[in-house]
């Protein structure tokens, strides 16, 4: 009765299976036409091996033949139903490995391992196996439960709830009992029954060896009608899409044939900790080893058939599913459970400790068998240690995997709780882990879409802009002088990585005569196709690349083959991002470099590369590419791609690429996608810059002081999205191009002299330089400012209000001279040189007289400009200038027919007087003011060859010579008024003519169209000589001017200090400041003399009388008379500058000075007025009155004799002071 029950139950169970399989056949799509994961053509393999469960209470082997007989008797009556592993297919060579199951389990038992072909245990099973126990009984029981679940629910079509209920029912049934019908159904597979029985009773070794042969297994497998039927319908090519369509319906579909270790770390942590265990992840079918008990195979099939493991299984559920639960380690199964996706649907090879000593002959046979079926390796390594297949080598795959061991990286990455293999979310990503130099999928020439990749240089001749680097590397290859380490540094897009690749190809090129790389040999073809095994390119920017670099350095001696003639080149990109530990490993390698190993470091930031590494490398600098080179390459690309491009647009692209060819190619590619003609406007819109035409218009408005239009145009550009910093940089670049004369004006509207650097005048050039200086200073403020738009607009407004070049020169001279009193004597030379550099262009003829200049300018009036236009364009542009010179009328009448002449006409006489009066007020010395107001007259101001020349006339030769000593002070006073660089020429005119020129109405014949001066009788040969002497050595004018100004002021200061000590309080109100050298504006306006001059209350005769009284003070007499004169007159009269007394011409010309005579008849001065005494020198040193070395540089002839008043005894000096 029990037997019939068993039979009825068996039929019922088989009927359910048939019903489920038929439902699956109606729902599932044809995998041959609808699968997206295509398997190889010869991958139609299956394994119909069934696991026989054993009772928990045990059983004898004699029971199995009896059940096998009862099952055999019903074979003819019942319809044969074979279960098919939908996810796993095996080749015949792999199936043969099942026959050796007993022998392998015995070896595993001796090693205290828990690994079987039916199940691969995780933590619990490993612990049981190590503890001894009844681990094998538990393994077989769990295997039977796993098979039972798969056997009953393989093609289940229920929803997830049905799947969960089926799983629960399977668990309950497996815990209660083992059905006899189950054993009856499995009795058809007699050899397998004996194998399972042997697992329960380990003592039946003979029966196990007799029944476990692979031939019987092949017969049973081939006799499966279900398998044959599925083969006819092309179901053998079921892909992972079939898995995705079924895994929602199935309860379990795990394979029991082989469960791989994910990595070295997973195998070591959960099994016997064999360091040589490496598994490759390629999404192929399971590997089942045969005769030699080898489970070591890292060459897996590329067909993504799937391992049959439901990725939704949890760790808890996997403990009750036998062999399937260990296919994924605990940490990896968590990831699979969380993601719910099929990350790994292929097989992984299990490598055992005892298999390391297996022979390589079987590996060759097994690989040859797979190669015959069209199976290509995904991750494989050649026998010489390079990448490639292990076919034809003497090394086993386990040894090769030990050498490379990519999955050792997983063990290192487990420190942060993540697995290296789980970072990939697809099978395509798993193919990128190869270290054999193969390119990733999608990088073949047919699939390349980027211009930078499509037109990447493949030979040295195709590299542009790096001639020095290319020549050096070519010579190194030609002469076989290869360094172990190279360092390529430079900005992005300059060809560093391309050069490294070409260099690696040239190292292994076998060409003898041609240029390397030749492109024809096998090595060059492998390199160009991306299949080179001697080139490894790693990225130091990500953690995976850094881990790979660390692994290579650690295992470099074992990776490299012995006696290899090929160079192994390792290119490490972004090496400056590598951690310090990796650099220490590199340092060990650099100290003891290996033969035929070359490292190439590529970096854009040399500062972050350790100095010790830099000193051991051959460094090559990759400069930015020239715009012309980039344009040539862009033209070639545009021609090859049939792009409609404007040549000016290519220039603009190259200019905005900043020396990077990659950026230029990317820009061109983006513009080509717009489907329009590539023009400059399109490039500007893409890059986000402002066109040169708009910049020129903005610059012209800013320089013309058009405030409203400047602000309006600046706002328009900013509203368009332009960056103020970029605008300012563009303006600065534009100004530099204009100054250099290299700017090419496209628009005719702007093709005037202002934008052509060759036609710029001195004033225009100074204005542009000043604008460039303002822009450069404002850019610094702009980068740290929060309101950049306001700063930019304010800077533009400053460009229009800039001072004229003359003001700049005068101000700079004044500032330089004002520091002279406190600086050392060497500062005078520095000031002179600086001043000379600023106005070095002002060079005049030595023998130019007023008459000759006027004549020349009159005859060639077209070469000169009227002074009125100069004044209007420069002096009166700003409000400050208009306050100094009244704006009523113009200085010269433009309607006048003689506007082209160089002399001012009658209408300008009042203006000349006004200018002369203002010049006198700005003189720093009272004596000079009196002298100029009394005897000097400004008769004309003219412009000669771009230089402003002022003619000042004196009626007496002695006064003229005296005024020439103050030439520098007079020049500075006039420059402050006119705000231009002026050359002052002092001439001698008869007194009668001198009085007529300013006070009487000019006669029409004084100036005519020819420009001659007809009615001035004093312009004779003598006048020419005098003028020639006054303008002698004009090339040294700046030097002489500054030195004379400093010397005059020091003399004046020293004389006033000496006079102040004798009569305190008498001249306090006219005492100048100590640090004052050159006149500042309104310095002496508050003095009594200045107020008297400005009020013009004194007549010429009165001024002459006061000057005569002052001269009387200089008469040398006894001390009492001198003291009395000083007491009575000093409070009312200004002191006379002692410069005349300490000059050689004073003694020679004393008879011609009109009252200047010495009482003692000696050439010299009274000691009271002399500053050149020893006591005064010491006092000036104590008070730090600088300038003594300047006096020491004076001609020794100008010093007084030791027997004069300057050398009187100290006692006499004390008496005088008392």
Curated annotation (Swiss-Prot):
This is Protein STICHEL. Residues 24-136, 802-828 are annotated as: Disordered. NCBIfam families: dnaX_nterm. The lineage of its organism: Eukaryota, Viridiplantae, Streptophyta, Embryophyta, Tracheophyta. A motif (PEST 1) lies at residues 273-304. GO terms for cellular component: DNA polymerase III complex; nucleus; plasma membrane. Induction: By gibberellin A3 (GA3). It comes from Arabidopsis thaliana. GO terms for biological process: DNA replication; trichome branching; trichome differentiation. The gene is STI. Acts as a key regulator of trichome branching through an endoreduplication-independent pathway. GO terms for molecular function: ATP binding; DNA binding; DNA-directed DNA polymerase activity; metal ion binding. A motif (PEST 2) lies at residues 425-449.
